[in-house]
C-alpha cells in the first residue's frame, strides 16, 4: 500500500512544476543541479594544475 502511494507521487509531476509566477526561471532551475558537478570537476582540474600534491 505504501509503495503504491509513492509510485503515485513519483508519477505525478507536481515536484517538477514551478508556480506560474516562477515560470520564467524554469530553464535556470533545469541547470542548477549541474552546478555541484562543476565544482567536483573543478577540484580535479585544480589538482591536475598542482600535479596532485
UniProtKB/Swiss-Prot annotation:
Question: Which superkingdom does the taxonomy of this entry point to?
Answer: Eukaryota
UniProt keyword annotations, A-Z: Chloroplast, Membrane, Photosynthesis, Photosystem II, Plastid, Reaction center, Thylakoid, Transmembrane, Transmembrane helix
Q: Where are the transmembrane segments?
A: 28-48
Q: Which GO terms describe its cellular component?
A: chloroplast thylakoid membrane; photosystem II reaction center
Question: Topology versus the membrane, per the UniProt entry?
Answer: Single-pass membrane protein
Which residues are removed as the propeptide when the protein matures? 1-16
Q: List the disulfide bonds.
A: none
Any one GO biological process = photosynthesis
Localization of this protein: Plastid, Chloroplast thylakoid membrane
Purpose of the protein:
One of the components of the core complex of photosystem II (PSII). PSII is a light-driven water:plastoquinone oxidoreductase that uses light energy to abstract electrons from H(2)O, generating O(2) and a proton gradient subsequently used for ATP formation. It consists of a core antenna complex that captures photons, and an electron transfer chain that converts photonic excitation into a charge separation.
HAMAP family, per the entry: PSII_PsbK
Family as reported in the entry's similarity comment? Belongs to the PsbK family.
Quaternary structure?
A: PSII is composed of 1 copy each of membrane proteins PsbA, PsbB, PsbC, PsbD, PsbE, PsbF, PsbH, PsbI, PsbJ, PsbK, PsbL, PsbM, PsbT, PsbY, PsbZ, Psb30/Ycf12, at least 3 peripheral proteins of the oxygen-evolving complex and a large number of cofactors. It forms dimeric complexes.
Q: Which PANTHER family does the record associate with it?
A: PHOTOSYSTEM II REACTION CENTER PROTEIN K (PTHR35325:SF1), PTHR35325
Q: What is this protein called?
A: Photosystem II reaction center protein K
Q: Which gene encodes it?
A: psbK
Amino acid at each position: 500500500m505504501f509503495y503504491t502511494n509513492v509510485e503515485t507521487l513519483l508519477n505525478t509531476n507536481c515536484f517538477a512544476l514551478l508556480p506560474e509566477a516562477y515560470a520564467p526561471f524554469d530553464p535556470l532551475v533545469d541547470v542548477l543541479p549541474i552546478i555541484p558537478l562543476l565544482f567536483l570537476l573543478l577540484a580535479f582540474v585544480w589538482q591536475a594544475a598542482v600535479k596532485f600534491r
